[in-house]
Amino acid sequence: MQQQHLFRLNILCLSLMTALPAYAENVQAGQAQEKQLDTIQVKAKKQKTRRDNEVTGLGKLVKTADTLSKEQVLDIRDLTRYDPGIAVVEQGRGASSGYSIRGMDKNRVSLTVDGLAQIQSYTAQAALGGTRTAGSSGAINEIEYENVKAVEISKGSNSVEQGSGALAGSVAFQTKTADDVIGEGRQWGIQSKTAYSGKNRGLTQSIALAGRIGGAEALLIRTGRHAGEIRAHEAAGRGVQSFNRLAPVDDGSKYAYFIVEEECKNGGHEKCKANPKKDVVGEDKRQTVSTRDYTGPNRFLADPLSYESRSWLFRPGFRFENKRHYIGGILERTQQTFDTRDMTVPAFLTKAVFDANQKQAGSLRGNGKYAGNHKYGGLFTSGENNAPVGAEYGTGVFYDETHTKSRYGLEYVYTNADKDTWADYARLSYDRQGIGLDNHFQQTHCSADGSDKYCRPSADKPFSYYKSDRVIYGESHKLLQAAFKKSFDTAKIRHNLSVNLGYDRFGSNLRHQDYYYQSANRAYSLKTPPQNNGKKTSPNGREKNPYWVSIGRGNVVTRQICLFGNNTYTDCTPRSINGKSYYAAVRDNVRLGRWADVGAGLRYDYRSTHSDDGSVSTGTHRTLSWNAGIVLKPADWLDLTYRTSTGFRLPSFAEMYGWRSGDKIKAVKIDPEKSFNKEAGIVFKGDFGNLEASWFNNAYRDLIVRGYEAQIKDGKEQVKGNPAYLNAQSARITGINILGKIDWNGVWDKLPEGWYSTFAYNRVRVRDIKKRADRTDIQSHLFDAIQPSRYVVGSGYDQPEGKWGVNGMLTYSKAKEITELLGSRALLNGNSRNTKATARRTRPWYIVDVSGYYTVKKHFTLRAGVYNLLNHRYVTWENVRQTAAGAVNQHKNVGVYNRYAAPGRNYTFSLEMKF
């Protein structure tokens, strides 16, 4: 904050002006001793800003570790809570699949940590079971936020900075170093955080240790997390729910009597037939349970989830005596588990399902007959894989996901604060990173209510069933990076030049394994009674002449479903794609005096891939990306900004592998997706704060979708070849983005210093969607990835010394636009039909959040937040989007949408300690 003070001439000033020269003359005459004062150095750690990489800062958001703490960011959904225009993509099983920005999501938004690309969203093409459609996880590994020094979010094409994937934007994380924990002037530092989040009963415990002895230094961060599912508003799950369950009742037929041989201890058929049992048939019985225990499409609550995360980061290093040279290493391991049960799958059989299965399977031997008094033993039908399943057991569908990331590397850093050599900054690094997503699907039918994930079929549980399916997807990178920065002047023009180089050897591997089922049978046979006084007996099931059957202990049968080489989902042949890539980028941000800043960047990327499978669409891609920006400064309080940039996304590993339908397919040529971004803004700035408004235009082309090549034959459109991933679509969007922060003390110095207000707004509009004429069986691009227009208004106070602060935030979201969910599908016969992404869209909603902090003796900071203060019931589009056709694991068969309700009033607390 700057203030202007007017100098007023008065009697006191005149007296001092008159006296001081005389006093100075007397001192000089007395030849007083001169005294050299000690030089005072003030050091401050450089904070990352929006304009570090690109001169305009348009579309950029930067969050430091302090910002993450203040906003109480504990997971990926908290990171962008108050940032309109960027949203989390829900994976459908508790995990996430990256971010959505400007109408694109998942692999079209780059996600990197220290320049290392994180795993791609890889979705297998066929259903595992239950109500989810993806064979593999489809998730993107999440970042441990306690390891993060800063995160830069870029909205709009950004491949010149982040390479492939930055088609619509990028999210780049930077890892902490020892300096971020060691306080100024100290040789060691300890930081601890304990946090609790009420929305998911999440508990976080993190501790960071750092020390420096001579030139040696090290940092160790250990973080553990445990949480459940995000709980819906209490009103959404209030009450009880009822359902039908198949129960055994006596068969009314007069030909439904039987006796069991093993139960006739004292005689044969003639003696035992006096006490026959009756066959059972199924009849629906109404049952009522709590909303938490209910299973079925009308479930009110979200699926139960158990989430755990364990992470550690170790960064040792040595800084040489002149402090210009640093050599260090990095070791990181993070493992996250997401264990959930799909409770939209009914646990119990109903008469309708039972009869339908019976009709399809035909007559089943022994149906209706049971041993002892266990009537449920007589109710069974044909289930999945034609295995018999009994009505007495409940069905459970479970997804266990384990995400494991390991990284180790070396780095050399050269820093020249004097800026008197060829480089002000240079960094050379080598990293080896491996990320694996282990997705295990289990379907059980062997416990009373289906809740036991660990039950298995056994001989004493006839008609019990178990199915397993496991898909493990992994990616590895061996990345060598070099970065150089230099500032210099030419003809009174300031240049900030940077050069970046990189070389990567990478691999992608998908393993399909543990794909089998187990089924418990029972021994059953229809017996012929022995002759009675030489007369043959022929039972007919009547009460006086019941059937004579044998029911004994059965066995468990295990069948492998895995096949090899059949080119369908059951194909368990490992998939591997390997390759290499390199890039070279140069950027120069130029200051043209006080009136203008100009920046431009250029990047060249090369990627080559190969596979042992000749039907994989591998190949070589060469791409050129660029950006340019200008800031005009006609006044101290005004900036006029404009930038343009390009982006691209290379075909993903899943797209290269292709769509397999059983036939031998041929590799196809897939070009990179391309984007072009234009953005113009105006910035008002001063002691009052700043306010930025911008307009953007994003054009996408060569979007990759699954479909067929089309050809005209005999005047009619016909398909050509097999289904494949092809470049087929283009689209264009425009929008408005507003950001602002007001310092009220700067507006009027009578107001308290530290009082501020913030404002953010984002709106996106779809302008154009096109399909290539030589493509068919193509779904038009549905913009379900666009976040509804959103306003975020805040006001808060930070005590000038940082001892305490409080903040209130109002978030208002408009309804989801129906036009963004409507599209059409080009059919094989040349016609088209209208389509809709999902059956529901969200209504407008608003919430109020309040948070604050208090620091005790500079070492302890207590933070607390009340979210959805007014306990408003609402549903976010990000949650409902899990039912959309483009969802990673689409939620199907959804009867009610209560389960997508956001949390009601909830609380977050954290205690931070720094020494």
Curated annotation (Swiss-Prot):
Q: List, alphabetically, the CDD domains matched.
A: ligand_gated_channel (cd01347)
Write the signal peptide boundaries: 1-24
Please indicate if the UniProt record lists Signal as a keyword: yes
| A GO CC term attached to the entry | cell outer membrane
Q: Where is this motif: TonB C-terminal box?
A: 898-915
Q: Name one Pfam family in it.
A: Plug
Which InterPro entries does the UniProt record give?
A: Plug_dom, Plug_dom_sf, TonB-dep_rcpt-like, TonB-dep_rcpt_b-brl, TonB_box_CS, TonB_Hb/transfer/lactofer_rcpt, TonB_lacto/transferrin_rcpt, TonB_rcpt_b-brl_sf
Q: Give this protein's Gene Ontology molecular function annotations.
A: ferric iron transmembrane transporter activity; siderophore uptake transmembrane transporter activity
Membrane topology listed for this record: Multi-pass membrane protein
Q: Where in the cell is it found?
A: Cell outer membrane
**Which residues are in the TBDR plug domain?**
51-176
Renumbered to this chain, region (Disordered) spans: 526-545
Q: Which Gene3D superfamilies match?
A: TonB-dependent receptor, beta-barrel domain (2.40.170.20), TonB-dependent receptor, plug domain (2.170.130.10)
Motif TonB box covers 38-45
What UniProt keywords apply to this chain's record, in alphabetical order? Answer: Cell outer membrane, Membrane, Receptor, Signal, TonB box, Transmembrane, Transmembrane beta strand, Transport, Virulence
Cysteines paired by S-S bonds: none
* Membrane in keyword set: yes
Limits of the TBDR beta-barrel domain: 187-915
Enumerate composition-biased segments (Polar residues): 526-540
Query: Subunit info?
Result: Binds both human apo- and holo-transferrin (TF), via the TF C-terminus. Forms a large complex with TF and TbpB.
Q: What does this protein do?
A: Neisseria acquires iron by extracting it from serum transferrin (TF) in its human host. Acts as a TF receptor and is required for TF utilization. Binds both apo- and holo-TF, via the TF C-terminus.
Q: Which family does it belong to?
A: Belongs to the TonB-dependent receptor family.
Q: Which NCBIfam families match?
A: TonB-hemlactrns, TonB-tbp-lbp
Q: Which PANTHER family match?
A: TONB-DEPENDENT OUTER MEMBRANE RECEPTOR (PTHR30069), TRANSFERRIN-BINDING PROTEIN A (PTHR30069:SF54)
Know the name of this protein?
Transferrin-binding protein A
Q: What is the lineage of its organism?
A: Bacteria, Pseudomonadati, Pseudomonadota, Betaproteobacteria, Neisseriales
